[in-house]
Amino acid sequence: KNMITGAAQMDGAILVVSGADGPMPQTKEHILLAKQVGVPHIVVFLNKQDQVDDDELLELVELEVRELLDKYEFPGDEIPVVPGTALLALEALIANPKTQRGENKWVDKIYELMDKVDSYIPTPERETDKPFLLAVEDVLSITGRGTVATGRVERGTLKISDNVEIVGLKPTQTAVVTGLEMFKTLDETIAGDNVGVLLRGVQKKDIERGMVIAKPGTITPHTKFEAQVYVLTK
């Protein structure tokens, strides 16, 4: 459920596959879900390289992953694949948080991975000129401050003190934005941001995943709609 919620909003994804074990059943499921919800680009990280003694085995795993991506209509031949080990990179960074490029081969692999992400996954144009819309993913209650709704801004911009409507599942209600946070406090959030919106006068029980926060008057609830549904089985 959480994978689907997140994937539906991604500009791209890093697919992590164990170089020691190869693709697992959930690997196939995640690739299929990524395709179903429209994730446009994937970069592959072959983890646990330190546990693979034979380079040919790692090459076989890479080939298997590329074939799997091809099967689900991703361009398996051109997708970047970076081998490495997340654990040893993390241990090196814990030992020395200021580790720079060229100082540790496993940390360098993470830098290489992020270079591939930057070069292969383009930054899409954001719809900042349209009315504000955010799909609620989670709701938190912060003592002394109020209710925070988190999610991805689908379009538009939002500033502190703006009025918004909370729409869906329950009667539409209005609220005032008293704070915006994305790793740090913001004055404004724009399309593409994953943000926490602090709302005045709204109880945690009044808002839940599946609702949207929107510019007043721009979104209305509907009782009928057409949808394409993909059913998962256990």
From Swiss-Prot:
| Catalytic reaction(s) noted | GTP + H2O = GDP + phosphate + H(+)
MF terms in GO? GTP binding; GTPase activity; translation elongation factor activity
Q: Which residues form the tr-type G domain?
A: 1-125
Asked if the Swiss-Prot or TrEMBL record annotates the protein with the keyword Membrane, the reply is no
Q: What class of enzyme is it?
A: hydrolase
GO annotation (BP), single: mitochondrial translational elongation
Q: GO CC annotations?
A: chloroplast; mitochondrion
EC number in record:
3.6.5.3
Q: Which residues form a coiled coil?
A: none
Which Pfam families does this chain map to?
GTP_EFTU, GTP_EFTU_D2
Record key words, sorted: Chloroplast, Elongation factor, GTP-binding, Hydrolase, Nucleotide-binding, Plastid, Protein biosynthesis
As for subcellular location, the record says: Plastid, Chloroplast
Q: Which InterPro entries match?
A: EF-Tu_GTPase (IPR050055), EFTu-like_2 (IPR004161), EFTU_2 (IPR033720), P-loop_NTPase (IPR027417), T_Tr_GTP-bd_dom (IPR000795), Transl_B-barrel_sf (IPR009000)
Enumerate the residues binding GTP: 47-50
Summary of the function given for this chain in its UniProt record: GTP hydrolase that promotes the GTP-dependent binding of aminoacyl-tRNA to the A-site of ribosomes during protein biosynthesis.
In the record, the note on similarity to other proteins reads:
Belongs to the TRAFAC class translation factor GTPase superfamily. Classic translation factor GTPase family. EF-Tu/EF-1A subfamily.
Q: What is this protein called?
A: Elongation factor Tu, chloroplastic
Its taxonomic path starts at: Eukaryota, Viridiplantae, Chlorophyta, core chlorophytes, Chlorophyceae
